[in-house]
Each structure stands twice: as C-alpha cells, then as structure tokens.
C-alpha cells in the first residue's frame, strides 16, 4: 500500500515537472502578516477580495464573518476589475477572490466569472478563488 502511494506521488511529481518545471511558487493571502526566515508578506502582494463585502449568511464558528472585514470589497464585476487594475498598479502579483457564504455554503461568484477571466488575461494577475465550504 505504501509503495503504491509512493509510486503515485513520484508519477504526479514527474507530470508536474514536465508541465511546470521544478520551481514551486507559494502565495500567502495578504490579510495576515507572515514573517519567517524564508518569507515575509507585504500587504499589497496578494490581497484578498470579497464579492459579498462583509455579508455572510452562515457566520460559522471558525470565523463568524470577521475575516470578511479584512478583505477588500468588490460587489460588482466592474468594481472587481477596477480594484484589480488598482492593485496591479500598486504591485500586486495576484489576489484571492472569495466572500461570505450563502445559506447553501457557496460563495456567489457566478456573475463575476467574466470579470475574473479579464483580470487574468488583461492584467496578468494570478487569481485564486474560494468557492465556499
């Protein structure tokens, strides 16, 4: 069993290197300051954006919606693109786009799909999305 898992991991690494090379990049959301001997975050390098502002229907115990208050709000697709343009000009390399959850646990990102594509294609930002729980 362990040998089988090791073989799968080795194969996955081989495929990864063939497609992406040996460099591994790590991104840390900017809402928390990180400083280690290997990495120090900056507030504008990889900001977090909420498409719901401070709204969250679930208010889960782990966050209670408080994390949303650390995020930049972008409530419309146009606001999202303009915010990302500004962030790019300020030196951002990417962003995390998320927001509060709806009652079913999803983050309402559907109407932002086209704007997210434009952010990637036109601005060249690395974009991560958190789609819900």
Question: What are these model-derived regions, one by one?
Answer:
Residues 29-31, 37-40, 47, 52, ...:
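Conserved Radical SAM active-site core
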Residues 1-54, 58:
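Flexible, acidic/Gly-rich N-terminal and inter-domain linker regions that tether
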């Amino acid at each position: 069993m362990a040998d089988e898992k090791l073989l799968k991991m080795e194969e996955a690494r081989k495929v990864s290197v063939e497609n992406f090379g040996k460099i591994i990049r790590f991104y840390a959301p900017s809402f928390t300051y990180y400083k280690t001997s290997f990495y120090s975050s900056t507030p504008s390098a990889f900001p977090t954006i909420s498409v719901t502002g401070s709204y969250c229907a679930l208010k889960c115990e782990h966050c209670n919606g408080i994390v949303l208050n650390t995020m930049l709000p972008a409530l419309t697709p146009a606001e999202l693109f303009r915010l990302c343009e500004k962030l790019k000009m300020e030196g951002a390399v990417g962003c995390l786009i998320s927001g509060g959850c709806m009652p079913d646990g999803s983050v309402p990102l559907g109407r932002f799909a086209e704007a997210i594509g434009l952010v990637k294609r036109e601005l060249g930002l690395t974009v991560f999305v958190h789609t819900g729980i």
